[in-house]
């Protein structure tokens, strides 16, 4: 049986990336919570850097 998680970087960026988070009110809430907590990476795309673009 095929597994459910078939990773794709583009899909990962588009669904969980910084711009996607910024596009909704709740997404911005997520980012501010992660900033307040002092997370090293705020979102998937910010963690990927130049290699992911």
From Swiss-Prot:
What GO biological process terms are annotated to this protein in UniProt?
Answer: translation
Q: Which InterPro entries match?
A: Ribosomal_bL34, Ribosomal_bL34_CS
Where are stretches of biased composition, namely Polar residues? Answer: 42-53
Q: Basic residues bias: where?
A: 1-16, 26-40
Q: Name one GO molecular function term.
A: structural constituent of ribosome
**Residues in the signal sequence:** none
- Segment Disordered: which positions? 1-53
The record's Gene Ontology cellular component field reads:
ribonucleoprotein complex; ribosome
Q: Which UniProt keywords apply?
A: Ribonucleoprotein, Ribosomal protein
- State the similarity comment: Belongs to the bacterial ribosomal protein bL34 family.
Its recorded name reads Large ribosomal subunit protein bL34
Protein species of origin = Pelodictyon phaeoclathratiforme (strain DSM 5477 / BU-1)
Gene responsible for this protein: rpmH
